[in-house]
Design a protein with these regions (language model features):
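Residue signature of alpha-solenoid helical repeat architecture, marking inter-repeat boundaries
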Residues: 19-20, 60, 64-67, 114, ...
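Conserved alpha-helical positions within TPR/SEL1-like repeat arrays
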Residues: 31-34, 64-75, 121-136, 159-170
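Residue-level detector of the short coil/turn that links helix A to helix B
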Residues: 37-40, 77, 138
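Single-residue signature of alpha-solenoid repeat helices
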Residues: 45, 91, 143, 180-182, ...
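Alpha-solenoid helical repeat scaffolds
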Residues: 47-50, 89, 96, 103, ...
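Conserved structural position within tetratricopeptide repeats
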Residues: 51-54, 100, 107, 151-152, ...
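Residue-level recognition of tetratricopeptide repeat
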Residues: 62, 105, 123, 157, ...
Length: 203
């Protein structure tokens, strides 16, 4: 069984093989804009990303573009520090676009190909981010479903189990009946331990 470093090397090789270089460069540009808290340049970079969607890219690459655009709208919300329904709606829309592509083309795929593996990884991150977006709207049940959808792809995806554990911790006290509170507290602990077991996979 490959160790963590071998898994990372395999993923990086798969990602660079499957995802077009122009899209990989754009992903890095978005990351740098967020690190620099450069909100002014994010909207024009989103327009560049949207223009790439009309290109003849493979499905995984288009999933990555939608994922990056969704993250950019999330980053705008975080940098500006204000609740923006407009940004949140666009974030939800692009995450859903990425996941629609995954569910239509790869959901039942049993292939071990590089493209399927990359699509699964983008889908896990998209489900997790979608769960966090719904959590921001206090739509806890839908958010729980999103985190669990990510874990159905791989229960080693620690970002999903970590966020699910945190959400269940917040959701448990909202229950009226004691046994319901206990149920969600136990579920919270279960996913916390799962995160601990897979913490090497945290990003």
């Amino acid at each position: 069984m490959p160790n963590y470093k071998e898994k990372i090397a395999e993923f990086e090789n798969n990602f660079s093989t499957v995802i077009d270089k122009s899209v990989r460069d754009l992903s890095m540009a978005f990351d740098n804009l967020y690190l620099d808290k450069n909100a002014k340049e994010i909207p024009p970079t989103i327009k560049l990303a949207e223009a790439l969607l009309s290109g003849e890219h493979n499905i995984s690459t288009k999933m990555q573009i939608h994922y990056d655009i969704a993250n950019a709208y999330h980053d705008l919300r975080m940098i500006e520090g204000v609740y923006s329904e407009r940004y949140l709606e666009k974030e939800l829309y692009h995450l859903r676009c990425a996941l629609d592509m995954y569910e239509t083309n790869y959901y039942d795929a049993d292939s071990n190909s590089a493209e399927v593996k990359v699509a699964q990884y983008i889908a896990m991150r998209s489900y997790t981010n979608l769960g966090n977006a719904y959590r921001a709207l206090d739509r806890y049940i839908v958010a729980i479903d999103c985190f669990q959808d990510a874990l159905l792809i791989s229960d080693d995806f620690a970002m999903a189990s970590l966020n699910l554990s945190f959400l269940l911790f917040r959701y448990a006290p909202l229950q009226i009946k004691r046994y319901e509170q206990s149920y969600y507290h136990h579920a919270c602990y279960y996913y916390y331990k799962q995160t601990e077991r897979c913490k090497i996979n945290l990003e």
